[in-house]
Amino acid sequence: MNMIIRFSLSIFLLSFTGPLFSQREMIDTAVFQKIRTAELNSSEIPQIAYHLTDVSGSRLTNSPGFKRAGTWAVESMKKWGLKNAAFEPWGEYGRGWDIEEFGISLRAPYTGYIIGYPLPWSSNTNGEIHASVYEMADGQLTDSVWMEKHRQDISGKIILLTSAATKHEEDFKANSHRLTDSELVKIPDTYVYNHNQIAFILPMRQRLIDGKMKLKSFGALAVLDCRGTYSGGTVFVQNSTGFRANSPVLPPEATISTEDYFRIRRLLASGEPVEVALNIKGKFYSDDTKAYNVIAEIPGTDPVLKDQIVMLGGHLDSWNAATGATDNAAGASVMLEVVRLLDSLQLKPKRTIRIALWSGEEQGVYGSYNYVKNHFGNGETGVLKPEQSKVSVYFNLDDGCGKIRGIFCDGNTAVKPIFEQWLTPFRDLGAQTVTLKSSGSTDHVSFEWAGIPGFQFIQDPLDYESITHHTNMDTYDYLKLDDMKQSAIIVAAFVYQASIRPDLLPRKTLIHEIFPFEGL
């Protein structure tokens, strides 16, 4: 009901016969109204999201689920009328993985349930194992002297790694949140990292790998851990190793809920013997170790501008404990809806509109980074390819399913007043913030690195960080479909405006820096 009321108000704002800001940006209000009407009356977002989540399943890069989702997207875009819809290889990645059997339970001091999930690319237990649990800290895993001293304690055990996980304390804050006007005014840089920060963690990661290899050599049967501070059975599941063709074979590993983690620790601390049964049977897919993005286009119609490109996208890959609904089937669904909407309205963009659904984002934005290197050049060396100069902009969506409240300009002062004008017709939808602050850690960073304007939208967080992000709860039921429809309206308008304006969007100076996630 609220969306309908907001739409009615918007008609008043967009009812002018001429373009707004005629002395600056030429905004086609009639097209904006068509986009709104079509999306609110005939959105296909619910069906698109359903196919990417419930039907496709989890979407680890190179897994059957990713291929199901990508194939459906390619075939759907062909049916909608887009051109050149296809999987495009971007380079060497590694193995796919999918779970075939999994079970975990407490067997002593009594039989009971444990909420847990296998880490993606975990090795197999080769049937159910049943063993005592031995507790050790993350720091001890990297202490070779301590490890050697406790070799006999480790042998034949399931190891519980203790970490920074903290017990849930009720804080009486709502799990879901919309940004207030005061928060939008003060919005900070978000998820921004440089290469030095990323490089700092790489030796630490290698030490953990080495420690787990030593556990295996000492006879440890498996590893259990707990990642994060979630409660209510919500389990955070991700893994940074195991997918490369030459990855070492580590002990089987699963992640368990904070409640079960602390229960086991309390039992061990009191001297109770704790035994766990664990079965992990996964399947590795290594016939094709290249990875693929999904690409399609709406061809430009202007004889002069049709070779220039406006890009939009989001990553299609996810983690394995759920179906990756808010991260990032939501963003992928919105972007698919945008191109479906624009093509169905036969708007005839002057520039070519190209959508990209990326793979390998969760491991280090590999899909977009390699796509940019393959097509546009190297931002570190400054050796750029001819196509780089033809890309006006890339728009990204990857912060959950909340409605768009604005856009990060990533320090691009020249583009800020342009976006402010483009957003003005959508103030009634709650989108009005245009900030020079930056958002990082997702695929637009690849374009920025190569000197191409790349932007992430500001979205209401809802329960993205509190419940769904990289967890077993990231399912279709947490999607806010009306919010996603609002996002599709705004992204479609931005993409269309970029495709028809006389000039390419303004660029920042190329910095010539190492890609932030190089080496991951």
Where are these regions (language model features)?
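Metal-dependent peptidase/peptidase-like ectodomains
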Residues: 111, 131, 156, 166-168, ...
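His/Asp/Glu-rich mid-to-C-terminal helical/loop segments that flank catalytic regions of hydrolases
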Residues: 245-248, 252-256, 263, 340, ...
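Short helix-loop-beta-strand segments that form the rim/entrance of peptidase-like active sites
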Residues: 47, 188, 341-366, 389, ...
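Soluble metallo-hydrolase cores and metallopeptidase-like ectodomains found primarily
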Residues: 30-31, 122-146, 151, 241-325, ...
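Noncatalytic luminal/extracellular "stalk/propeptide" segments of secretory-pathway proteins
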Residues: 24, 50, 54-190
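Second-shell loop/turn segments in exported
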Residues: 32-40, 54-64, 120, 124, ...
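N-terminal capping segment at the start of a domain
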Residues: 27-63, 236-243, 317, 393-399, ...
